[in-house]
Amino acid sequence: MQVRVRLLLLLCAVLLGSAAASSDEETNQDESLDSKGALPTDGSVKDHTTGKVVLLARDLLILKDSEVESLLQDEEESSKSQEEVSVTEDISFLDSPNPSSKTYEELKRVRKPVLTAIEGTAHGEPCHFPFLFLDKEYDECTSDGREDGRLWCATTYDYKTDEKWGFCETEEDAAKRRQMQEAEAIYQSGMKILNGSTRKNQKREAYRYLQKAAGMNHTKALERVSYALLFGDYLTQNIQAAKEMFEKLTEEGSPKGQTGLGFLYASGLGVNSSQAKALVYYTFGALGGNLIAHMVLGYRYWAGIGVLQSCESALTHYRLVANHVASDISLTGGSVVQRIRLPDEVENPGMNSGMLEEDLIQYYQFLAEKGDVQAQVGLGQLHLHGGRGVEQNHQRAFDYFNLAANAGNSHAMAFLGKMYSEGSDIVPQSNETALHYFKKAADMGNPVGQSGLGMAYLYGRGVQVNYDLALKYFQKAAEQGWVDGQLQLGSMYYNGIGVKRDYKQALKYFNLASQGGHILAFYNLAQMHASGTGVMRSCHTAVELFKNVCERGRWSERLMTAYNSYKDDDYNAAVVQYLLLAEQGYEVAQSNAAFILDQREATIVGENETYPRALLHWNRAASQGYTVARIKLGDYHFYGFGTDVDYETAFIHYRLASEQQHSAQAMFNLGYMHEKGLGIKQDIHLAKRFYDMAAEASPDAQVPVFLALCKLGVVYFLQYIREANIRDLFTQLDMDQLLGPEWDLYLMTIIALLLGTVIAYRQRQHQDIPVPRPPGPRPAPPQQEGPPEQQPPQ
């Protein structure tokens, strides 16, 4: 009975609200409220009659869910048929297509009204509620602005259930929402193809999806497409289009867009170079959490580029990035990136760059298929980590390791254990299987298996935690030089797990592991030097170690992408990728970008800007200790490439390369400058000294040094002649006193010996000429055999 009364009161409130809203709508037609505003207060609806009625209805109907359900259940048991009629009448104000055809069970699914009035729903501005009622979206609220429809939306909106949909949105907002939902679906389709394919044509198809989503202002798609246009990744390189997208993303507050725009201003691509603007955009990108922007700022503060040099500021940025890189390190170690310097590769074509030729890879594959265990293990490791021209492929790695493990190879067993312990899309994670392989490998004395078994006991993976056994197996692995064992031993001593805390021992094992190239070893050493734990605090050392960790992040894969672009003669794409990596502080990228610009192979940079930008990056690479870059700086100042001719500055760079890196080329150049007196006072003796040093420093320099010394001897003789008075010399010269009274006999003897040597040489040369022999008789031509004579028949 109580429910009946409340429903009747609701009907009265609705009818009064409908009439009041009609009159109010005529006089307040231009009024509107924010469609996404918060819940209204009493003050915000005091001037709206319908709002008052809604609040009145709310006060009458607010009950706890349990109370309403109890009352409804009682009423159902007493008079089910009467309640059906009552409910049907009470909701007859709904302007749905066929309300009378809905059954009672469907009507029971109507949300219990919380009657939360939403600001603006009782006014003339259309609104839209993106949730379903009776399996339909209530577009009646948006189409003709009916007061009863809007009132129903306001009084049946369940805040707790429907807050995820937002509040009331206008038609324009609803259209944007539907567009973004469509764009998100297109973006996800493109990313699915992109992540699940390895073929270029499939990746190009994926970027077509992403371009379509980007055209619908999908932020993540815009970020992907903008960088693809910048680098020419599966799309035609278009710096101007990338710039426009970066500007659009920057307006929306995208950290990736801000970082991209900062890069364009830093490198002067598509815009006038401005280091001040670059610094501003990099800073905003870093504040938004972009790790590349943090790396750029870390390097700039470390090297003092555009900012005051500050080791502590560099430490802050590098440590933040290093924390993310260290957290992403997997048990298998992740992918390996090959760093190849283009200047070294061109200067020394025979130098081993570390890349495997396709023919050699096929040869190893042939051996592996024939059962060569070492080839199987080697290919498994290559595919597990990638690098050296081989793409990372866990399926192939697993197959090769499985073949070798079945043949009894302990190394393959240990790596199978690592793959099972880590888990992937190819190999399901299984502590039991990993433990099985680790034990088999460890029993055979394999350090990888011993280290894996130690990890199992340390963290309780498939076994009970046992620090003593973990320490035992790590020590065995470390004694054999395995970096994982050394790293874990250092961690146990650092944290005092299973052993007494000992920072000196931790430092010892971290240093050993870092010599093997383990990323986490560099990270732990950086933490110790940054905080002064176990060592004297050193900001400079900590920054260098953190920088090393940061440069092994996932973005380092761009190095190989840029190298492949260069090998494919796509110099514009290569130089842009190297330039971005150079901004992040990669020395190899700085030298490679400078080399491409030096060779004038990239047309994306104007001719007048080529040498100045190359000089900039040679300078940055030289400051990080690259010898060739330091010599190039001397060459640029010597010849005036990208700057004025400055022999003194050139001499300084050559001397630095000679003293710090013991470069034979720099020593030779110093000898030449001393010989000519360029940038320094002429000194023949110092010139000879540097020439001799160059010959000792490199065997390749011996031939040019010999020629230079011959020339230097002639120069020295001519200089002596110029300085001496020849006429006075001969008048004062007494040959009898110098060579003795028979000096003329000595001279004649020497001339005779020389003449005899020449005659003997000529005779031997004449005897060595072969005497032509008369041609012998030619052999008779072979007689052609005719057809056999036919025997007469007998």
From Swiss-Prot:
Residues 22-738 are lumenal. The chain crosses the membrane at residues 739-759. Glycans are attached at N195, N217, N272, N431, N608. InterPro entries: FN_type2_dom, FN_type2_sf, Kringle-like, Sel1-like, Sel1_AlgK, TPR-like_helical_dom_sf. Disulfide bonds join C127-C153, C141-C168. Residues 23-32 have a biased composition (Acidic residues). One of its GO terms (biological process) is retrograde protein transport, ER to cytosol. It holds the Pfam family Sel1. Sel1-like repeats lie at residues 183-218, 219-254, 255-290, 291-326, 373-409, 410-446, 447-482, 483-518, 519-554, 627-662, 664-699. Residues 122-170 form the Fibronectin type-II domain. Residues 1-21 form the signal peptide. Belongs to the sel-1 family. Plays a role in the endoplasmic reticulum quality control (ERQC) system also called ER-associated degradation (ERAD) involved in ubiquitin-dependent degradation of misfolded endoplasmic reticulum proteins. Enhances SYVN1 stability. Plays a role in LPL maturation and secretion. Required for normal differentiation of the pancreas epithelium, and for normal exocrine function and survival of pancreatic cells. May play a role in Notch signaling. Homodimer and homooligomer. May form a complex with ERLEC1, HSPA5, OS9, and SYVN1. Interacts with FOXRED2 and EDEM1. Interacts with LPL and LMF1; may stabilize the complex formed by LPL and LMF1 and thereby promote the export of LPL dimers. Component of the HRD1 complex, which comprises at least SYNV1/HRD1, DERL1/2, FAM8A1, HERPUD1/HERP, OS9, SEL1L and UBE2J1. SYNV1 assembles with SEL1L and FAM8A1 through its transmembrane domains, but interaction with its cytoplasmic domain is required to confer stability to FAM8A1 and enhance recruitment of HERPUD1. The interaction with SYNV1/HRD1 is direct. This is Protein sel-1 homolog 1. It comes from Rattus norvegicus. The gene is Sel1l.
